[in-house]
Regions:
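Short, structured segments at the rim of ligand-binding sites
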Residues: 1-169
């Protein structure tokens, strides 16, 4: 029982009861393995301990990469990523609930030649850096000219001549 007196709060001694906590793996980090699977001609990658019952919003990456040619097979032990057929010609997605996945998705789409329009990206301009500008600045060096607005980023699928020896910063 807690006791208060003027500007003092007294809390009686108690016993510490340690408990085990299971910290689930990071789905944001898993997004890069999805990207590798999407870019590879063939892929089968196992990521242990990832669950489709995750509390993390970025677990949506499994569904977001399906149209990019990566299927997710869940088991008790984790998830197996497999290369599958890409079936879309334009990728449109609202990423307002998972804006941190935009960088991985944008680069993947460019490298596989898939035009896209991602919306819900307004928070990316106020992260540790302006991530929208960073994507534009680095991908133009590889020949991908991205078009941005306050809330979206898109690429029409057209490439320009990249720098002869681009320096990615």
């Amino acid at each position: 029982e807690t006791h208060r007196s003027n500007n003092t709060i007294r809390i009686p001694a108690g016993r510490y009861c340690p408990k085990q906590f299971r910290i689930e793996p990071d789905w944001s980090a898993a997004s890069y393995w999805y990207e590798i699977a999407a870019l590879a001609p063939e892929a089968e990658i196992f990521l242990p301990n990832l669950s489709n019952k995750s509390l993390q919003g970025d677990a949506r990456i499994a569904a977001l990469f399906e149209p990019l040619g990566v299927s997710s097979l869940f088991s008790q032990e984790g998830i197996k990523l497999r290369k599958s057929d890409k079936t879309i010609s334009l990728y449109e997605q609202d990423l307002s609930e998972q804006p941190d996945l935009a960088q991985t998705l944008v680069v993947t789409c460019c490298l596989i030649g898939l035009p896209f329009k991602f919306t819900g990206l307004q928070t990316l301009k106020i992260k540790e850096t302006d991530r929208i500008s960073a994507l534009q600045n680095e991908l133009i060096k590889l020949g991908y000219k991205l078009i941005s607005s306050d809330k979206s980023l898109e690429w029409d699928g057209e490439s320009i001549t990249p720098k002869v020896a681009p320096v990615i910063e």
